[in-house]
Amino acid sequence: MRLATIRTESGTRAVRLDADRAVETGDADVGALLRGADWRDRAAAAAGPTYPLDGLDYAPLVPTPEKIICVGANYRDHIKEMGREPPPYPTLFAKFPPTLIGAYDDVLLPAVSEAVDWEAELAVVIGRPTRHVTAEQAPAAIAGYTVLNDVSVRDYQNRTLQWLQGKMFEATTPIGPALVTPDELFSGTDPAAGLSAEITTEVDGEVLQRSDTDQLVFGAYMLIAYISEIITLNPGDVIATGTPGGVGHARKPPRYLIDGAVLTTRIAGVGELRNTCRKEKV
């Protein structure tokens, strides 16, 4: 099953994406849907107003998650290009809801920086309250997977040892277009092994990142277990699992996003983001 949040004339709506149409579930957005314990059954049975798939205006998948937890230095090739060793524990930081944009919305390049970089990421969306679970128990916490680009403002990020200021600029983080439930992604495979899918970033059609989600140092299940030691994960929370090698900042010379560039982020079987970069005017 695939779920999305779309913009309509009467506000945002959660929808189930069928092969030929989008069907309203009766909720304002996917986050609101997930807060109901019976969300899966309700979404599967939904028979609300419908929309053609062509031309859907995708809002951020979960517009106002309680938590957006990101993971740094979590792909082996990215760690190598940074000249580091794999960390013994996940490197965690946060984003806030104002950073999020829809799957085809414009990425806002901050007026104060010329060093804005791309980071393709697999994101996990939580589907039930989760605290103190093991990695073996973690799959039950997952509502689904989606695509995120952790667009990063490198000069601000590197001003201090804390990355937050380079990760929290408004309207920089596309997420979506859909939440894909595990049963669809793992059909015929063993979900215990985690998701293996090609992940890529293109800028103006040039492939700049290409890897596989099986290259994660800490996979989704391990991350959920670790984070749940620290804080309760609630329905709609987003975990961005990290980016592979090929970021612009690590290139020689460095490359960054510019006004008018088209940023395409793709994970096989999960979805595609396509965002035009626009320079902020102040």
Cite the ranges covered by each PLM segment:
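N-terminal non-catalytic cap/leader segment that marks the start of a structured domain
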Residues: 1-90, 192, 200, 206-207, ...
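A generic local secondary-structure boundary/capping motif
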Residues: 4, 58-60, 81-83, 107-116, ...
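Short, structured patches in soluble enzyme cores that scaffold and shape functional sites
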Residues: 7, 95, 111, 118-122, ...
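Catalytic-pocket segment enriched in acidic/His residues
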Residues: 9-10, 51, 78, 84, ...
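Residue-level recognition of short, solvent-exposed, well-ordered loop/turn junctions
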Residues: 63, 70, 117-119, 234, ...
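Structural signature of FAD isoalloxazine-binding scaffolds in flavoprotein oxidoreductases
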Residues: 86-103, 118, 258-269
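RNA pseudouridine synthases
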Residues: 126, 133-148
